[in-house]
Every structure is written in structure tokens, then in C-alpha cells.
Amino acid sequence: INAISNFKVEIFRDGKLVSVYLEELLLNSFLYILGCALAATIAPAIVAYATSRFNFRFNVVLDGIVIVTMVLPIIGQDAALIQMTKTLGIYDTMIGMYFMKFMFLGFNYLLFKSSFRGVDKAYAESAQLDGASELRVMLSINFPMITNIFVIVFTIQLMGFWADWTTPLIYMPHSPTVAYALYELQFTSDPLLTFKPLQ
């Protein structure tokens, strides 16, 4: 119990060294993982629905962008991204992290797109004959039909964001998470926290 009460991370806030304890670390972690996982699940689902439902010429371009970003490493983007978030005023905020994670690029887009293509269009057509809007068709018919894919993608995103300590360190330096605290634990000299089974 002493080890848990001493579990903390020291960060600089307003030029002062501040200790962030387990309660705040857990709160930051849950806000980070839940919001980011939700954003990273909803964005590809919406874009995948639009590209699978409507045949635009631009769909091929979107698919190409997704594939290219999966194949080519984007090295050196952090400096530009930090500058952009500072310019927009969303650096070091949770809402800024949510905006950053609200993107459709990646494997989840392809997974959602193939799932939406597997849904029979007769359901949407019959709903539209009854007067349902396109938004209603998307939210009430197509999304519930692939709930299992939503749950799988959301769970994978949760696990990924739970273990991610570098992104909060870079983009939210004043809101450390438990993952970052566990990373910092290997460098501590506190005798209550250097007990080997704890590490």
C-alpha cells in the first residue's frame, strides 16, 4: 500500500516541479484511452460507410491514400504536428488528442469498408422508401449490423492507447498517464518503488 501511495510522476507545470499521483494518472489515462479509442473507431467507420455506400471517383483516391500511408513510414511528422497543434491552441489538451486521433487512415478503414460492403443494400433501400434519411439509414440500419466489428476495433484501440506512453508525453506533457508513469518507474530510486516484483 505504501508503494501505491508513493507511485507518482514528477513533471514541470508553470515552471514548478509537481508530483502527479496515481489518482490523477488513472483519470488522465481513462480520459485519454476512452476518447481516443472512440475517435479512432468512429472516424474510419464514417468514411468507410460513405465510400462503400456511394460510388464517387474520389473513393479510389481515398483508398490509395490509406494504402500509401500504411506502406510508407511518415518520419519527422511530430515537429510539424506539434507546431500545428500549438497554432490551433489544442496542444496539451485532451480535446486536441481526440482531434488528432479522429482520422480514417489505417487498417480499420479497410476493415469497416469490407464490412459495410457485406451489408445488403436492400435494407437501406426499404428504409428510404419508408422515408428514412441517409443519416438514419447509417445510424439505425448499417452501423448496428456491424456492431461486432465496432466492438473489436474499439477494444484493439483501447489496448493500444492504454500501452501508449510516448504520445501523451509529447502532446500532453502536463497530463501524464499510467503508461508513462510505468515507463518512468524503471528510472526511480525510491526504495518503496524499486522492489523487484513491483517493477
Model features per residue range: what roles?
Residues 1-199:
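A structural signal for multi-pass alpha-helical bundles of membrane permease subunits
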